[in-house]
Amino acid sequence: MQKTPKKLTALCHQQSTASCSGSNYSGSNYSGSKCFRLHRLALLACIVALPAYAVDGRVTFQGEIVSDGTCKIETDSKNRTVTLPTVGKANLSLAGQTAAPVPFSITLKECNAADAKKANLLFSGAVTKGQLYLSNAASSGKANNVGIQIVKADGTGSPINVDGSQANSEKAPDTGKEQNSTVIQPRFDYFAHYYATGAATAGEVEATATFQVQYN
């Protein structure tokens, strides 16, 4: 809050009354006089013109705007269909059984070194939270008790999260490394296979997943 020092207030009062010196205004006739009105206006103008002499605090705000990542999705990875072979239902008679793994990859392009290192993929499908397979969404004649599961191609067979809650950052070991500061093409390798949720019945199987490139 702006504060007016007492000495400066007194000085303003002294200067504002100088023009009324020698006048005969006093007592009750002073409060309604022209001199009184001039006195009051001069004092107010003097106080308003005074600079602020006290600062009680300060708040500094800081932030940052970052650019979008440089990576783009390779054309043949952007919208693709992975076809799994036909299998007999006997191969998927128990919950948790898998069959017919098919490899596929998603490749990024035009990444700078920093983005290639931070890039990961976030998969989302029509699944419930924590579900580690894509539900069968075939429109007609679909097989029951079976879905599609995406797993890592690193030999562990670990399923990829497909509910949009956790991204996968594991890239193929021969990609995504700095190459003399040139553009880099990191590749994400996977397998897709049938996944039984019970004794599978005969029919069509179809599932769709979307993915986003994230940087962290």
UniProtKB/Swiss-Prot annotation:
A lipid is attached at C20 (S-diacylglycerol cysteine). It is a lipid-anchor. Belongs to the fimbrial protein family. May be a minor structural protein required for pilus biogenesis. It comes from the Bacteria. This is Minor fimbrial subunit HifD. Keywords: Cell membrane, Fimbrium, Lipoprotein, Membrane, Palmitate, Signal. PROSITE patterns: PROKAR_LIPOPROTEIN. The gene is hifD. One of its GO terms (biological process) is cell adhesion involved in single-species biofilm formation. Pfam families: Fimbrial. Residues 1-19 form the signal peptide. It is found in: Cell membrane; Fimbrium. A lipid is attached at C20 (N-palmitoyl cysteine). It comes from Haemophilus influenzae. The keyword Ion transport does not apply. The lineage of its organism: Bacteria, Pseudomonadati, Pseudomonadota, Gammaproteobacteria, Pasteurellales. Residues 159-180 are annotated as: Disordered.
